[in-house]
Amino acid sequence: MKKHLLASLLGASLLLPTAVNAADYVIDTKGAHASIQFSVSHLGYSFVVGRFNEFDGKFSFDAAKVSDGKVEVNINTNSVDSNHAERDKHLRSDDFLNTAKFPAAKFVSTSVADKGNGDLWITGDLSLNGVTKPVTIKAHTVGEGQDPWGGYRAGFVGSTEFTMKDFGIKMDLGPASANVKLDLVVEGIKQ
């Protein structure tokens, strides 16, 4: 009798709806399947472009319940690379990133909004140069699925823009150069 009761309860539990949780991913920086690039107008005539070579992060994502998503990214600001050694030294100085005092930047999401057609708005707190302010990353889902090595991956692209002075960056190159645009490519490996 006890065996039948246990079997019935176990069978009934399989019929109950199960909660679907967002999957956890680690950003694939080891395989170089992610990047954080920046661009700043150079006096209104051209653009200075560069990237951060060292960062890591994680995110949670469920396409059926996007609003449950979470993102966290840590950036080694000493890894700034604009392909020009003297400029990179200046970018690390207290005129810009002040890496001696603030060697890391961090983004932590506070909300993720589904805008339809794979578009997401990821709002969160960006900590840079000792200042934390909200920013919104306008992102797009590239795709997700099995990889050839037996894992599962999800990929996104996104961008955001902010004013340097909002983050205590002292250098003033004029109004044409006041903003920084960040372009992000993220591929995560499901954990």
From Swiss-Prot:
Which stretches are annotated as coiled coil?
A: none
Q: Quote the SUPFAM superfamilies the UniProt record gives.
A: YceI-like
Top-level division of the source organism's lineage: Bacteria
Q: Name one GO cellular component term.
A: periplasmic space
Gene3D superfamilies, sorted: Lipid/polyisoprenoid-binding, YceI-like
Question: Which PANTHER family does the entry mention?
Answer: PROTEIN YCEI
What family does this belong to? Answer: Belongs to the UPF0312 family. Type 1 subfamily.
Q: What is this protein called?
A: UPF0312 protein Sden_2128
Q: What is the lineage of its organism?
A: Bacteria, Pseudomonadati, Pseudomonadota, Gammaproteobacteria, Alteromonadales
